[in-house]
Amino acid sequence: MLAIYKRELKSYFRSFIGFLFIAVTLFFLGLYFSVYNLMNGYPYFAYVVSSVTFLFMLTVPILTMRILAEEKRSKTDQLILTAPVSVGGIVMGKFLALLTIFAIPVAIICFYPLIMAQYGSVPMGEAYLSILAYFLFGMTAIAIGLFLSSVTESQVIAAVLTFLVLFLGYMMDSICSIISSTGNLLTKLLRCFDLYTCLLYTSPSPRDGLLS
């Protein structure tokens, strides 16, 4: 599993996909952080991470589209399967490589609440819980992308499927609101697939307070 992990991690940074993912993620997080927290003085970092959840729909499909689909297309998956490692170990090694790339920008934004604290009172517990929720949410999105990459040999199809599933999760709250009149049972079932609202509920309104 360790060999698979190292191989995948190196391949992502050699192809610059890893660098691109980190750069785009940090750019948008930094942009929202600068506008909401530094320029306007909102003390809640949760509002920043909940505002950039849309980014998963764009970055995760690109990050995960080749992770298993390329192996199937080039038939190298057959070679890997003959290696002295279980299928679960192969999948876990690839997943941990993806998770490591995602963990880099998450580790960097852990310093953002400390920067905010230099300008006023900041609810640190809430800030770091929101970062944890953001990380767990990213893990879920990456796991979805990894699974969908395993069902096709085409990287494009894998990326499109991942985008559609994440987009459906992003829109699920709106869909549930539209069809709520059809019955509570259907609405409750659909809300099981609502990937985004749980994170949005953790962030208070930016009008709830200012750094002072």
Task: For the regions a language model picked out, list residue spans one by one.
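Aromatic- and glycine-rich beta-strand/loop motifs that create alpha-glucan
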Residues: M1-G18
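Alpha-helical transmembrane segments of multi-pass membrane proteins
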Residues: K10, R14, E70, G88-P105, ...
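Hydrophobic alpha-helical transmembrane segments of multi-pass membrane transport/permease proteins
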Residues: F16-V35, S51-L63, L164-L168
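Secretory targeting signals
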Residues: L29-Y36, F45-V48, L55, A97-A158, ...
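Transmembrane helix segments
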Residues: Y32-V35, T152-L199
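Transmembrane helix boundary and interhelical loop/hinge segments in multi-pass membrane proteins
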Residues: Y44-F45, L63-L81, F95
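Single conserved hydrophobic/aromatic residue that forms the stacking wall/gate
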Residues: Y201-P204, D208-L211
